[in-house]
Every structure is written in structure tokens, then in C-alpha cells.
Amino acid sequence: MRRQAAAEQSGDRSPHSKKVASYKTAFLQGLRMTTNRSKCASTVFIAVILSGAAVPHVSRVGAQTSQTASITIDASKVENRISPLLYGQFLEFMYQGIKGGLNAELIRNRSFEEAPNIAGLSRYWERYPDDRNDDYALAFHWDDASAYPPQRPKVDTGERAMKEHSPRVDARDGAIQRHGLYQARIPIRAGLEYRGYLWLRADDYKGAITVALESDVKQGEVYASADINVIAGDWRKYEFTLRPEHSDPLAQFVILFPGRGRLWLDQVSLLPGEAMPGGVRRDVFEKIKALKPAFIRWPGGNVAQDYRWLWGVGPRDERFTWVNLSWKNELEPSDFGTDEFILFSRAVGAEPSITVNVEGRGATVEEAAAWVEYCNGPRTSKYGAMRAANGHPMPFGVKFWEVGNEIWGDWVRGHSDADTYARNYNRYARAMRAVDPSIKLIAVGDNNMNWNRTVLRAAGENIDYLAIHHYYGRREMAGDPLNLMARPLFLERFYAQVEQLLREIVPGERIKLAINEWGLDLPDERQYSLESALYGARLMNVFERSGNLVEMSAVSDLVNGWPGGIIQANRQGLFVSPIYLVNQLYSEHRGDKRLAASISSPTFDTSREGSDVPYLDAVASRTADGRKIFIKAVNTSPTSALTTTITVQGVIAGSQAEIETVTAPSLTASNDFARPDAVFIKNKAARSGRSFVVTLPKHSVSVITLAVR
């Protein structure tokens, strides 16, 4: 996952004219909601702005005294198909993208591998009841001589093996009778069942232990508890159920040691009974399912070049905790592995798309082929038998496989030049297809056409999709917010260049694009504002206009990871970004065929992304059965609504339209945990017909649905 935009810039590099400066000032004023300035300017034929035959026609209009626009749709003319795979999503092991965000596991650092504090307790664990008084009768030691499981299969990364740890507990008779350890900030709900377990090895410990959910504020207030009788001997799993009587977003999970003697503790787990397939949080699961993702890409991203898939299969408590080299060496549990990812993806209605590690951190072509066999091989094969032993006798049938991630970037393990990558790609493709010839392979592309040219010439015959990633942000905008509003149109021209390259090197329209990472590098309040949604919607309109080439896309990221995550989930709740809202609307109203459309709109100029850029961006599509037409209209003006005349030719439209609009009182309004609906979707009905007028609010994204007779 590249956290910077493509190096290319476009448009006029000359100094600002007074006209450009005035438009930039107006946009900034619009951001601050201190002006009602409107601009009346001429539009130009959109081919000058966008180029290529796949874009709508915009006619020239004269100077205007009010902000008006028009959209004319020819429903009898289909410009291109729109792929059913177009709107997918992207998950990565990145901070709390998986752990704490997607995953329902409530215990952090449940295998005690994080470094300990002075008391000998690993990260997130504290001494109970607290540190007010000396508890001379209870001692902890972060022990690397005993841990569960005692042995794991070796996965060679070329790195020094990480020692496994568990806390050794010595409990004696003392003044503080109710003592142990705890984790804070556990969100619980009254009446919901919480299923947990832990592993214990008891030496000479005599007595029981107690697990409980308690109040952190009112010490001693117990919501639910269970006693566990400890059996002396080697490692043993103890299960328990807790059903709290009260809700508390900041409860404690407590493990108490009323007995006497020595024991070891490891692999503690606490899951809400409502956890969804793959062990996913219910609230996050429901938000993802509402997006109707066509596919979900995993495990990365940059981290795909670190990840070794064997870490994340097999019994949950026997999996590895691994160091995430891509993201500040965070330790990652392997609770969410291949099986969980596929179960989760299918449960939300998405096809899994797996990115294999190419030569990073000791990865090999044999390992990639083995992963395909684990997912798709018969149970009689070596790795198919492993899958069956893990509870899944039938093949998963994973269709989409990406061969490496951003290999051109020196921030990933396995980085190489294009020639080396192409040779490696061919080796991996042959080995993976030898296991399952039906799989679709995605190769690493770039915004650099020289990279694409080299890879396509050497490996084009083995490629189904070329993955290209787009990031854009503060550095590229150079202080001009209008650059952000225009940037997607540069990418539309870029896709035309890629299409021409494909025709030259790999003719036949066989290879398609997967824009399976796109995002913005903006401060978080702007990431979660309407401004970002306008950029996202215009870019997604570009995807639909480029439907002959672009078949897959995914915003970066789906859950947390960085401010671009469109679902931001903490332990107590979540909110969604305006880009999430756009994704939801566009996925629900994808359409199967894009219709010819011409647009008349006022325009603006930018400092880097060209001039005479239309404020209005629109795409029209229809469903396969022809009974509905969707019009996706983005008004990027920061200050003016657009009174828009819509004319539909070639069909008879119904008398009423449904309009769903992503909007907010101001361009700077942003969603957060305190104000999760500052930017929202507004629904209304409007009169429609062969020709009708709608008002597209300033800085808004609207989807207009027409019934067709």
C-alpha cells in the first residue's frame, strides 16, 4: 500500500493567472463557508479536458449569470459495460485494521508476546486490583522457557526466531486476598453471552482461579464471574462463559488467583456470542455487508510482501504471532488467517482476492503454489488435506490471486526492477496455474508506463489483470484544493494511455485494470469530510466511463489502518467516512451498461490539473433488464448549487425519480465518533419524465434512479 501519490503531475505548470488565483481563493473560502461567490464561466468540449472516445460530450455554453447545467442521456446507445466486479474492498494487516478493528476478539495481546513492564506483565495487562499497595504475595515473570504451544512448525523467514512467552504466576498467602491481573477497556453489553477460554500449566498450584467482568470505575462491582478448577500438570485448555448483568463500554476482564503455588497462563480469549463468520465484529460486519463488495483483497498491501500464509492456518492457539515489518514492527496475532478471511468474505457476499508474497521475507514460488492448493486443491492433495484437517473438506475455490504488491517500491520486501519482476511473475504464474488452471492472476502495474511496458512485454500472455494504485494528497495539491477536484480526470486520460499500450503489446482486450488501492493523503478531518467524498465519487465515475478497461477497484482501506480507512472502528463503536457513503451508493446503483451522455456545466481552472474543468461530473447507466436508469451526478462546486435539466432519450421514463444525495451543511463537515452523521445520505422523491429539472446541492454527490417503461 503506497502512502504517496503517483509521481506524475498534469495540467498547466505556468504561474497562476489572476483568474486561477481567484478560483483557488473561492474554493478556500468555500471550505470555510465564508462566501457565496458563484462563478459563471464557459464550458468546453469535454474531449479537450478528458480526451478519448469513452468520455461524455460537454457542449460549449455562453457566460451565465446563474449556475445551471444539463445532462442529456441517449438510452439507446451503450458506451461500455460496467463490470460486476467494479466495486470491491481492501483489507490489510495495518495497526488495528484486523486486530481490534475487524476481529471480534476482545483480548489484546492474548498470547503475551509484547514486551513486559517492570512488574513482569506484558503490554495491556495490569496488576489487579491496581498498583496502590504492595502485593508481596503475587509475582509475575515474563517466561520464555514455557509457552503454549510448546512447539510450532517452522516458517523460515531468514530472521532470528522469536521466542514465545507466557506469564509465570507465583501466588502465596498475603494481605491482599483478591489479586491477579486484568485488561481494561473491554466493552460489554448486558445479557450478551461472552465465550472465553485460557490455557494453564500448573506446577504446584492448588485451588481455583476466577475469571470475571468488572467495573473499572467502581472497583469491586462484578458484572459476571466464573470459577475454574485448576488441574495440575501440562498445558490444558479451560473454557468459560460470562453473561454480564450490566452494560459497560470500559469494563475490566479479570483473572484472579485465590489459590497457592505456581502456574503459567497463555492464549487468553474472550469473544462476544454475536461474532460473525471468520470471528468478525458484528457491527463492522454489518457495515461491510451493506457495501455489497464484489470482492475483498487481503492480506495487503505492503504487508503482503511480509506475510507467510502458513502462520495463519491450523488451530487458532497454535498459530504464530509475527512482526509486521511494514507498519512499525507491530506484533500481529494470526487469529484472522486464510480460513477466516474466506469465510468472512463469502458471508458478506464477496469473492476473496488473495495477494501472494513474491520473494519477500523468504517467500518462494513453491509457497505460493501451496497456498493455491490449500484453497483450491482436492482433499487428497497435500495442502488440500491440511485444509480438510482444519475443518474445510470442500475446496474454497478462490478465483482471484494477485502476484505481489507494489514490487517497484523500495518500501516492500522483494522489491525489484520490472525485468526481474516479470521473470518472477512468469515463474509464479506457471506454478500457481499448474495447481489450478482456472484462477485469474493479477500482476503488479504502476503509474510509471515504463514499468508497465516492460512487464507486459515479458509476461503479458500470462496476465489477466494489471493492478495500479493511486494516492493523492497535500503535496500534490500544492495548496490548491481545486487540484483535488480535477485529479480524477487526469487518471481518465492515463487509463486511455494504458489502453493504447495494451492494444500495442497484448492485443485483444484481454487484460483489464484492477485499481485495487486508491486513496488520499489528507489530515483526518479532511479525510472524513465531504471534500474527500467529492474526489472519490468523481474517480468512481471515471471508473464507470473507463469500463472497457477498469474492471476492479477498491478504496484504501476498508477498516482502520490509517485515516483513509472508510470504516473507523474503536473498541466501543464505529463511524463511516463520506467515501464509505459514496461506495455504498455506487455499489447499490452500479448498473450493467453505461449509456451515452452529454453534459453542459460551468467550469473552473486549477494550478496543476488543467483548466476549464467541469464542476459537474455525471455518468448514466442502466440495469441488465433495462428497467432502471441510474444517474450519478457529482457537483464539485464549493459554493453553488446546480439547477440541472435532465433529458432522457430513447426510452420512456417514469413520472417519479428517487434522489439519494451525500451532503452536509458545509464542505468541511466531517464524520467522527462524536458526530458520526455530520455527512449523511438524504433521500427525496422528484418529478421526472422525458425532461425534468433537479437541483444538485453545492458540494454534493447524488444518485438519481429512474424507472423505465
What are these language model-derived features?
Residues 227, 612-653, 659, 702-705:
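Carbohydrate-binding surface patches
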Residues 357, 387-388, 429-450, 495-521, ...:
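Aromatic-lined carbohydrate-recognition surfaces of secreted/lumenal glycan-active proteins
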Residues 93-94, 480, 511-617, 627:
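Aromatic/acidic polysaccharide-binding cleft in carbohydrate-active enzymes
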Residues 363, 367-372, 446-471, 518-532, ...:
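Substrate-binding cleft/loops of secretory-pathway carbohydrate-active enzymes
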Residues 64-334, 351-355, 363, 369, ...:
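Extracellular and organelle-lumenal recognition/adhesion modules and their flexible linkers in secreted
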Residues 1-2, 11, 15, 40:
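Glycine-biased, low-complexity coil/linker segments
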Residues 326, 330-334, 340, 427-430, ...:
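Glycoside hydrolase catalytic-domain groove-lining segments
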Residues 266, 394-413, 452-491, 511, ...:
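Aromatic- and acid-rich polysaccharide-binding/catalytic face
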